[in-house]
């Protein structure tokens, strides 16, 4: 299978000087939903001169969709590090049914880890799903519900899988809670203010650098 064209599939930011590099920069793939889309360019900027950052243009949506697109988004790119999240779309509630029930969510996460390990030598980092402000989210009238209690439930399920599989966790949920979610989350109760995205980007960058070489940015 041909490698996907970056201009069509990825937002790719090569952060390097114009001169040829003696040692190729490590390649990092960011996978996740619209929260990832928000922090991806900030992560790329923070990794300037240290990595090639790839971030698929499409929203990753739920864990089943990530699994379905894993070859295109991850495997074919042969990354050195994969920073991945899924969860906020899985726990969407409509007509009293979750988009992806938590038991299936766990199975999907296990399959994602297995597929990445089978198809690449990449280091994997899992990011927890970020908090929801229930009242503000409900005001969106988006045709589905999300609740913070479910975010916590799905994160707990993900943490169990990652602990069992020895995958390090970038706990973005705790980061936002500790930083004051009411001031970091925007008026839709889900997405972030510019300051919020900067805090997320710093944490994501930190986890990637720690995975690659033990560096710290904060």
Language-model regions: role of each:
Residues 1-3:
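N-terminal secretory signal peptides that target proteins for export/translocation
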Residues 22-24, 45-50, 65-218:
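Alpha-helical cap/lid subdomain in secreted, periplasmic
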Residues 26-40, 62, 91:
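Catalytic nucleophile-elbow at a beta strand-turn-alpha helix junction centered on a G-D-S/GDSL motif
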Residues 52-54:
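Short, structured active-site-proximal loop/turn typified by the sulfatase FGly-forming signature C/S-X-P-X-R
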Residues 56-61:
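Short beta->alpha junction loops
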